[in-house]
Amino acid sequence: MQLLKVYIQETVMRLTTELVPLFFLTYVAHILQIHGLGVQVGTYALVMLTISVVATAIRIYAQNELSKMPPNKRGNSSFFWGVWAVQAVILIMLALGTWGLINGANLPYTGIFKLQLLFYVGAILDISWLYNGINKTRIVVRRDALLQMLRFVPLIILVKSPSDLSRFIVLLAVTTIVANLLLWLRLPSVLVPVSVTTSNVKFHIKAMLVFLAASLLPQLSLYLNKAVVFVTQGVEDVAVYYSAELLVKVGVALVLGIAMAMMTKVTQQKQIGNSAGIAKSFYDAIEYSSALSILIAVGVATVGPQAVYWFLGTSFAKTGDILQVLAFVIVVASWRYSLSLQQMAAERGFRNISASVQVGAGVNVVLTVFLVPKFGVLAAAWAALIGELVALILQVILLSRVVDVWQLVRVSWRYIVAGVVALLGILAVIRSVPGPYPKFSALEAVVGIVIYTIVVYFFSTPVVTTTNIVVMLALKRMYNSLIEFTRVVLRIDK
């Protein structure tokens, strides 16, 4: 039950920031249509190429240093102002350089590009790394949730036609700025006034160079695919790729909660010095993530292409082809996250835990640059999948002294079989129904879930055993609550 509680907490936090944009997507896709959405996504991706690398490097550096510092407000304050000064100066210089490039290069959609520069203001004001570093993460989580809520009503009021693209971009940027400003309002409770010397600033700049190099490839892989698709294939292709990617991110967020929850088991085993228990936690993480990720991936790959027609519109039909490739990223990423997060919790002497991420991101970037211009938007999806596969393989190699590859296969093959059977069942339904309508998409999803569940129960896996225990405990509590409610209403003494 404790694992279930942690999973729900972790998943809810992530889905808040993933599901709301998904709801926005269906509205924006119908209002701005495929061209408007493509222009927004493409220009945003190009602007974020520089912002994301710098902001991520600063965030990782600051959080890492703050977590090692003693809980002293004066020390934290001196560190904060020194790092933020570096953040502000670098991002202002990048913003000015980007402004000059936009004006001098005679780019298409110049007006839209200039509006996207407002995100530099949001990045300059983003101090979430301070709260994460001093273990006040809930403040950042609330900020992220509030950010999505701030956008909801204004979106419906202000964005009503394809001509409202500029309003949409300003809305996204301004709400980001407002949400980040709210973090500044809490500074008096965590910092005190201090003086900042130039020596502190110079020290931070030198220390950040390593983190800048470490964040380069992973951040490029997040935005370069959409940027290259936008430049070489056009606005419509980048819109359909972004739509597919957003749907897949929701699937990954659902599974990532399992990996986060399983970290508590690794920590407990480490505290009692149980090496065998730590190794078993790796296998358990893979098993539980497989059980959920394979089901979600099968649904995304089969039901997703049908649902796209009514969820986004017929102009987004190409999104279905991309989903059939990106869906498998859900499974591969869930395995990689499960292994890497358990590795971090175990602290078994692996210093270069980012090696797999760096190599996988590098493969993704290289494939994107060379394949997308020639083979189109589907190549971007394959580049993402291959990059994740390379990262997973390298992660397994790094853990070869701790985990057995064949044991990983043994704990996951039954869910793969269940996924294949569910896939065949869903395809049979798709061929039987008259078309891609919401009621038929719901039917396909239900059929897939039922078939998958039956096959998994047939194998009597550990996930089934755990599920039975949780269900029986839940039913017992419901029964006891009903008895107690009846006793109180009827005034029956115990």
Question: Residue ranges of each PLM-predicted region?
Answer:
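Membrane-proximal transmembrane or re-entrant/amphipathic helices at the cytosolic face
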Residues: 427-494
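Interfacial/gating helices of multi-pass transporter permease domains
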Residues: 23-51, 165, 203-211, 229-249, ...
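Hydrophobic transmembrane helix module of multi-pass membrane transport proteins
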Residues: 85-217, 222-223, 428
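Membrane-water interface segments that mark the loop-to-transmembrane alpha-helix transition
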Residues: 6-17, 21, 43-44, 48, ...
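Interfacial segments at transmembrane-helix termini and the short loops linking adjacent helices
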Residues: 101-116, 301-331
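Short runs within selected transmembrane alpha-helices of multi-pass transporters and secretion channels
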Residues: 17, 21, 44-51, 55-63, ...
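Helix-loop junctions and terminal segments of transmembrane helices
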Residues: 54-71, 244, 248-290, 339-346
